[in-house]
Regions:
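Accessory terminal helices/loops
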Residues: 1-5, 78, 166-171
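Conserved beta-strand hairpin/beta-sheet module of binuclear metal-dependent hydrolase folds
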Residues: 1-50, 143-155
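Short Pro/Gly-enriched beta-strand edge/turn motifs at strand-loop
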Residues: 1-3, 100-104, 125-129
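Conserved beta-strand positions that form and line the central face of beta-propeller blades
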Residues: 6, 18, 29, 90, ...
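Short Gly/Pro-enriched turn/cap motifs at secondary-structure boundaries
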Residues: 7-9, 105, 111-113, 133-135
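Metallo-beta-lactamase
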Residues: 25, 34-35, 97, 121, ...
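Short catalytic-loop micro-motif centered on adjacent basic/acidic residues
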Residues: 28-31, 56-59, 131-133
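Active-site HxH/HxHxD metal-binding segment of metal-dependent hydrolases
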Residues: 34-123
Length: 171
């Protein structure tokens, strides 16, 4: 069975997902937005308590609220960041993005370890997430679609009750 655990993290109430195969314990983290230490503990605690093996750290896009926890995931689970290269410029100015919202970043963001492109497949046990490139909210926005469960993870491409924002840099 595909298990989907949702967390709301950081001052922006960003959604972070841990997607796992209950049989193999393999999982992916989508949009590690955990900013505060207690949020990081909640995320890693869930993964450790459920004996999950993190295979992927997937970013739907590289706006800061979706990536505050990338370094924590990398340091804790030794998994690099997977994101679309069209969003790489956002990593270069993440400190400036944060200061616009009165947020301090302790460390620079981790770089993209694996570039994701249209139709790339990410296997989690017997399940597959297919990458669909949907520029608009950001140039590198990605939806991860699981055909077997008919579910999509799209970051800020859609908001509840509206379309996602397209007025941000690169949108």
């Amino acid at each position: 069975m595909l298990v989907i655990k949702e967390f709301q993290f950081n001052p922006f109430s960003e959604n972070t997902y841990v997607i796992s195969d209950s049989e193999t314990g393999e999982c992916a983290i989508i949009d590690a937005g955990c900013y505060y230490a207690d949020e990081q503990d909640i995320l890693s605690g869930y993964i450790i308590d459920n004996n999950l093996k993190v295979k992927y750290l997937l970013a739907t896009h590289l706006h800061l609220d979706h990536n505050f926890g990338d370094r924590h995931v990398y340091n804790t689970f030794n998994v690099g960041l997977t994101a679309h290269p069209d969003d790489a410029f956002l990593l270069d100015n993440m400190k400036e993005q944060a200061s616009m919202f009165g947020i301090q970043l302790q460390d620079p963001p981790i770089p993209i370890d694996h570039n994701v492109h249209e139709n790339d497949i990410f296997k989690i046990g017997k399940y597959s997430l297919r990458a669909i490139h949907v520029p608009g909210h950001s140039p590198g926005s990605i939806i991860y679609y699981c055909k077997e469960e008919k579910i999509a993870f799209g970051g800020d491409v859609l908001f509840r009750g509206s379309i996602g924002r397209t007025d941000l840099p690169g949108g």
